[in-house]
């Protein structure tokens, strides 16, 4: 039986930290589903389709290199329900520090009550990515800062194009 993992997030935009977790997560499961959470109350910088494309473009070659399977999906609602819907028995989460740990351990407890068949696996962020967040990347890009240390080149191009569009329309 294949081990299926679900790596949830908004990936707006996908960062080098996300890619690090994807690379390491692919070594733990046979099939990793990168699941983009959709929240109707938020307006993302990148469209859902753009995020799918960037994840597939950046993570696809990593999966191929490792001989693993990767796919993308979207979900709204509870992560544990999305895991169940996709047949995942593992939810993969990256931890950047103590604040992430506190929040994520609460979520593990809640998820375990809702579905005891789904386990959560924490991967500590690598030292060179533990400070990266999508929120900070968007803020830096919006202030004309250099985001190249934090995101892959294709992501940088898409983010900068979108930020430029937004500035034109103001």
Swiss-Prot record:
It catalyses: (R)-4'-phosphopantetheine + ATP + H(+) = 3'-dephospho-CoA + diphosphate. ATP binds at residues 10-11, 18, 94-96, 104, 129-135. It comes from the Bacteria. One of its GO terms (cellular component) is cytoplasm. Pathway: Cofactor biosynthesis; coenzyme A biosynthesis; CoA from (R)-pantothenate: step 4/5. Its cofactor is Mg(2+). Pfam families: CTP_transf_like. The record marks 18 as: Transition state stabilizer. Substrate binds at residues 10, 42, 79, 93. It is found in: Cytoplasm. Disulfide bonds: none annotated. Gene3D superfamilies: HUPs. NCBIfam families: coaD_prev_kdtB (TIGR01510), cyt_tran_rel (TIGR00125). Belongs to the bacterial CoaD family. Reversibly transfers an adenylyl group from ATP to 4'-phosphopantetheine, yielding dephospho-CoA (dPCoA) and pyrophosphate. This is Phosphopantetheine adenylyltransferase. It comes from Parvibaculum lavamentivorans (strain DS-1 / DSM 13023 / NCIMB 13966). The lineage of its organism: Bacteria, Pseudomonadati, Pseudomonadota, Alphaproteobacteria, Hyphomicrobiales. The gene is coaD.
């Amino acid at each position: 039986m294949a081990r299926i993992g679900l790596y949830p997030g908004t990936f707006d935009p996908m960062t080098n930290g996300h890619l690090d977790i994807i690379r390491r997560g692919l070594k733990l499961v046979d099939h990793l589903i990168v699941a983009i959470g959709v929240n109707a109350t938020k307006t993302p910088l990148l469209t859902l389709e753009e995020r799918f494309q960037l994840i597939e473009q950046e993570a696809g070659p990593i999966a191929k290199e490792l001989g693993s399977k990767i796919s993308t999906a979207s979900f709204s609602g509870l992560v544990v329900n999305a895991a169940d819907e996709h047949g995942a028995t593992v939810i993969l989460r990256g931890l950047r520090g103590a604040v992430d740990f506190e929040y994520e351990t609460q979520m593990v407890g809640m998820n375990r009550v809702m579905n005891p068949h789904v386990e959560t696996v924490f991967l500590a962020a690598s030292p060179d990515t533990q400070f990266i967040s999508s929120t900070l990347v968007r803020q830096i890009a919006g202030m004309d800062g250099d985001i190249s240390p934090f995101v892959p080149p294709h992501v940088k191009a898409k983010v900068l194009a979108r930020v430029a569009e937004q500035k034109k329309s103001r």
